[in-house]
Amino acid sequence: MKRTFQPSNLKRKRDHGFRLRMSTRAGRLVIKRRRAKGRKRLSA
């Protein structure tokens, strides 16, 4: 059976990348929350 997770760095960046996050208000709030929490990685 084919597994559901087929990793691809391109898709990863496109769907969860920093540029995408910054392009919407909700995405910016995500980055803001992660900065406040002190996350080492803010996005994919």
From Swiss-Prot:
The keyword Ribonucleoprotein applies. Signal peptide: none annotated. Gene3D superfamilies: 1.10.287.3980. The keyword Ribonucleoprotein applies. One of its GO terms (cellular component) is ribosome. Keywords: Ribonucleoprotein, Ribosomal protein. It comes from the Bacteria. PROSITE patterns: RIBOSOMAL_L34 (PS00784). GO terms for molecular function: structural constituent of ribosome. GO terms for biological process: translation. HAMAP family: Ribosomal_bL34 (MF_00391). Belongs to the bacterial ribosomal protein bL34 family. This is Large ribosomal subunit protein bL34. The gene is rpmH.
